[in-house]
């Protein structure tokens, strides 16, 4: 499972730097002890083969989750292969494979899969990109018939699509709705800058969604021709990973795919280049509906990308990973500085839209007036590396972080879910990504990471950054009175930064531990074991409770959460309004005198995270850790209770980033609609603060928020802590005694307070106009006061699932009027008893009234006729399959245990879920529909501006 460059980037922890001199050696001059010819081995645990007709397959037996197989049909063909009359048809073909095949006519395929618990969208799915189309099918494997049908389905996708004229025309509306959803500011700006980003390439004219004209008017033969030309064995792979023996899966593949014939004169599968250019292309795009300002700098490689084949290639990818780790640590430190130059920024070397070209890319999101400053910062930081290189301290920390992530993957190598494994096999087929297996990779990292020199990493910058093949893209809002950045300003900045002599980065030493004074340990005063749930609850000497569950679901994971009732519900209305937008910035100050950048340095090589929060009805603290870093987690928890820093500069940095992020959110039509509907539903509440804005962020009261935080976290004895994962019980009890029982306990036993305000009820319709694109959306809400009953809550949730099935059938498949539609229902008992049932869908303005009536008609059918047994059985089967998997997930247990106490429910009900599902009947669901879906409802409609 080779860590990709983006995976290395995403896993980066923020660090600071230390200084040494820059070595000027180039990468070519560096000698490696490993062979430049020795090939990267192939994972021996994976069965890879090729049928006589050219189809490739990958198989692995994997028992997590049990009784399930993940199937993928991978087609090495996407929109780049479309001819002019086929633009958008690679993606259209993906749709058609769900709408009629030889063995599953019309909607029978989705109907069958739903009947065995496979949910359309959430489980069953597919995607199309420039160079590939991938079909995703998880299938239950406890029944041989279900497994057989799963293979029949992917075989049908490969060569048995019916593609009748009627089916094609029926699907046009759905695909056009998906096309409509993609319209907006980002799409308009992208269409303008793509010719520069993808200069001279066919990629610029082959976005997978296609063109409206082709989608509306293409001849049936155009689609059939694409299917015939590109859906063929030599361009396909089947991936099968799951809880079935390899021999059985291999035989299934041979039986279903061995008979597919290759065409006699197959069209060559070309690859398409991204030509080099000497010029620097600059694209500056703005739009009045743009929500964010962004800056991108790309340095496209001169040479075409080559897959990693040898040990030397693999080692070089490790060098690139270290470079990405360190440059992003620097950018993250700047993000945390006073007057930050961007909301966030990152850099990495990786792929572009084109299969054959990679690039070094630096990116930042910034304020609407900060584009030049953000661009300057990105250019300077790259130039700083070029002039001075990285330094020894940050290099060592980067190696620790990368090795910690690799070690985590290695420890959990036998606990990885099948749906996380298949992606690597897909990339191996499409991109020739090596897949030697995590055991080999872990050993290789242990062997080679210490041998990588700082000189090797520093040499990369000269390869990455050149004036040719450079593209700079600025996108952002357009509004009256705002001066746009010009191309001349960008060129001037490029020349200026290139001439600057910059100071090297400075590193400041930090302490070994964040705990400076070890707290005096408390004691455990009571143990309670729940054999039914497999949990133990400790009562500590300060009154705090600790519930933990030892699991073997993951070897290197412990999850944690804690709460105490109260939150800002105990504030006055004025205090709530003054602090609500400040609370998120409190932890930015760090703890115990260490700022956030120093903390990140001290946490190098550790897998640990802790997040405190003051919510509306509770104060919470949550996180996760590797078992080896559990003490660090406990130390952080202790410090967030006792020693949160107060730092005006850090808080000011947080406010500036939030203002930059929020500054133009109201320009987005969908966001505007959500905000205005919120005001319509809740605007009369004295505690309703609405959507945060730059003006509201300026009014956030840091002093008051800090004071209130201290009050809310002053009594640890009122908290209940939860831990789930690979726990050493003796260690956890000792750590809880040392770091939790030692916290102040006052015996307060607080409860949240509930205001008298309730959302708007009754029969209402609100129409909100915003935006220029012909896009509308509809929300229908049934809600009001009730008496909470767990059985009714579950029934209303189930009605939402059933109604979603019916709405997809009616609004999408029959009417062709929507791409996505859904319904959700629940009854809550916190902060007060209240039911809510929501329906939402986007559509064309011309279809709003028709589809609204159609949706309400489906609701009425549930009231007058009740759901069918067939639809109820579909939902029940999905519930059962999902629950079976959840019962072996740490995250499920953490959430379930906490919520049982938080919502004051019986935790033992966790074990009664299956009987609860089996007890659902159509008669009872109809009664619930009559009770909750027969009355008033509120309709919100978003339309474009007239």
Give, region by region, the residue ranges found by the protein language model:
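Bacterial N-terminal signal peptides
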Residues: 10-18
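Active-site His/Glu-centered metal-binding helix of metallohydrolases
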Residues: 89-97, 323, 582
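Flexible, low-complexity linker/tail segments at the boundary of structured domains
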Residues: 231, 713-714
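Hydrophobic, small-residue-rich alpha-helical packing segments that form membrane-like cores
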Residues: 167, 172-180, 184-235, 239-241, ...
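M16 family metallopeptidases and their MPP-like homologs
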Residues: 58-60, 65-82, 88-90, 107-156, ...
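Proteolytic maturation boundary segments
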Residues: 21-58, 245-309, 313, 317-318, ...
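Alpha-helical scaffold elements lining the catalytic groove of polysaccharide deacetylases
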Residues: 215-223, 694-701, 705
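Bacterial N-terminal signal peptides that target proteins for export
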Residues: 1-9
């Amino acid at each position: 499972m080779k860590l990709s460059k983006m995976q290395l980037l995403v896993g980066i922890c923020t660090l600071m730097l230390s200084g040494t001199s820059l070595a000027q050696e180039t990468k070519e001059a560096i000698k490696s002890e490993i062979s430049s010819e020795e090939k990267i081995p192939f994972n021996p645990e994976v069965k890879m083969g090729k049928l006589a007709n050219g189809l490739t397959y990958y198989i692995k037996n994997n028992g997590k989750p049990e009784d399930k197989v993940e199937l993928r049909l991978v087609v090495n063909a996407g929109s780049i292969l479309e001819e002019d009359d086929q633009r958008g048809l690679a993606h259209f073909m993906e749709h058609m494979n769900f709408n009629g095949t030889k063995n599953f006519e019309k909607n029978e395929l989705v109907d069958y899969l739903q009947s065995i618990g496979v949910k359309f969208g959430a489980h069953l799915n597919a995607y199309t990109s420039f160079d590939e189309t991938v079909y995703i099918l998880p299938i239950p494997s406890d029944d041989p018939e279900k497994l057989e049908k799963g293979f029949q389905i992917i075989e049908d996708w490969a060569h048995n699509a019916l593609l009748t004229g009627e089916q094609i025309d029926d699907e046009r509306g759905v695909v056009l709705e998906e096309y409509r959803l993609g319209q907006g500011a980002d799409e308009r700006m992208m269409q303008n800058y793509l010719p520069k980003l993808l200069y001279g390439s066919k990629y610029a004219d082959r976005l997978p969604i296609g063109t409206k004209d082709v989608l509306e008017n293409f001849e049936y033969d155009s689609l059939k021709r694409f299917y015939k030309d590109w859906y063929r064995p030599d361009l396909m792979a089947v991936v099968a990973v799951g809880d079935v023996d390899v021999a059985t899966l291999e035989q299934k593949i041979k039986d279903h795919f061995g008979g597919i014939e290759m065409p006699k004169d197959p069209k060559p599968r070309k690859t398409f280049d991204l030509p080099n250019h000497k010029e620097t292309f600059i694209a500056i795009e703005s739009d009045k509906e743009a929500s964010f300002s962004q800056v991108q700098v790309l340095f496209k490689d001169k040479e075409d990308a080559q897959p990693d084949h040898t040990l030397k290639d693999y080692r070089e990818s490790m060098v690139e990973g270290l470079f990405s780790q360190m440059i992003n640590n620097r950018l993250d430190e700047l993000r945390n500085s006073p007057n930050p130059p961007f909301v966030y920024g990152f850099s990495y070397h990786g792929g572009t839209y084109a299969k054959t070209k990679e690039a070094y890319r630096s990116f930042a999101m910034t304020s609407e007036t900060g584009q030049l400053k953000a661009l300057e910062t990105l250019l300077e930081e790259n130039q700083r590396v070029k002039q001075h290189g990285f330094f020894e301290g940050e290099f060592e920390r980067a190696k620790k972080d990368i090795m910690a992530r690799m070690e985590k993957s290695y420890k959990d190598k036998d606990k990885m879910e099948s749906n996380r494994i298949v992606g690597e096999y897909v990339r191996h087929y499409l991109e020739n990504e090596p897949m030697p297996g995590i055991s080999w990779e872990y050993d290789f990292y242990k062997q080679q990471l210490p041998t990588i020199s700082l000189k090797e990493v520093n040499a990369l910058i000269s390869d990455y950054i050149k004036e040719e093949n450079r593209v700079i893209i600025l996108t952002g809002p357009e509004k009256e009175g705002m001066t746009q950045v010009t191309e001349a300003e960008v060129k001037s900045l490029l020349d200026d930064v290139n001439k600057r002599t910059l100071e090297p980065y400075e590193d400041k030493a930090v302490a070994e531990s964040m705990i400076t004074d070890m707290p005096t340990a408390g004691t455990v005063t009571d143990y309670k074991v729940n054999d039914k749930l497999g949990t133990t609850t400790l009562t500590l000497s300060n009154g705090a409770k600790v519930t933990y569950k030892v699991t073997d679901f993951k070897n290197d994971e412990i999850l944690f959460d804690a709460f105490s009732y109260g939150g800002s519900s105990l504030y006055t209305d004025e205090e709530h309004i003054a602090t609500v937008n400040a609370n998120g910035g409190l932890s930015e100050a760090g703890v115990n005198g260490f700022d956030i950048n120093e903390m990140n340095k001290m946490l190098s090589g550790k897998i640990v995270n802790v997040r405190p929060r003051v919510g509306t009805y509770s104060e919470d603290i949550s996180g996760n850790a590797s078992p080896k870093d559990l003490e660090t987690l406990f130390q952080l928890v202790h410090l967030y209770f006792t020693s949160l820093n107060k730092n005006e500069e850090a808080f000011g940095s947080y406010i500036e980033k939030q203002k930059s992020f929020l500054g133009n959110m109201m320009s987005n039509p969908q966001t505007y609609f959500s905000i205005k509907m919120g005001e319509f539903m809740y605007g009369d509440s004295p505690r309703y603060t609405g959507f945060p804005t730059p003006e509201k962020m300026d009014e956030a009261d840091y002093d008051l928020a800090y004071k209130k935080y201290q009050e809310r976290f002053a009594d640890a004895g009122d908290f209940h802590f939860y831990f789930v994962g690979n726990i050493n019980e003796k260690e956890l009890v000792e750590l809880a005694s040392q770091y939790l029982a030692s916290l102040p306990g006052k015996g307060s036993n607080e409860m949240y307070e509930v205001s008298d305000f309730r959302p708007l009820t009754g029969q209402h319709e609100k129409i909100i106009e915003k935006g220029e694109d012909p896009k509308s959306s509809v929300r229908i809400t049934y809600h009001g006061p009730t008496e909470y009953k767990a059985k009714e809550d579950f029934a209303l949730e189930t009605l939402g699932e059933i109604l979603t099935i019916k709405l997809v059938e009616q609004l999408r498949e029959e009417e062709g009027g929507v791409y996505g539609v859904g319904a959700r229902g629940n009854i809550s008992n916190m902060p007060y008893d209240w039911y809510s049932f929501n329906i939402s869908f986007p559509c064309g303005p011309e279809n709003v009234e028709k589809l609204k009536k159609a949706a309400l008609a489906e609701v009425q059918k549930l009231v007058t006729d009740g759901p069918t047994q067939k639809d109820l059985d579909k939902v029940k089967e999905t519930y059962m399959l999902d629950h079976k998997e959840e019962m072996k997930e740490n995250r499920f247990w953490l959430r379930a245990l906490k919520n049982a106490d938080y919502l004051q429910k019986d935790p033992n009900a966790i074990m009664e879920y299956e009987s609860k599902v089996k007890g659902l009947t159509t008669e009872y669901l109809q009664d619930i529909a009559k009770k909750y879906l027969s009355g008033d409802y509120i309709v919100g409609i978003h339309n474009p501006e007239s």
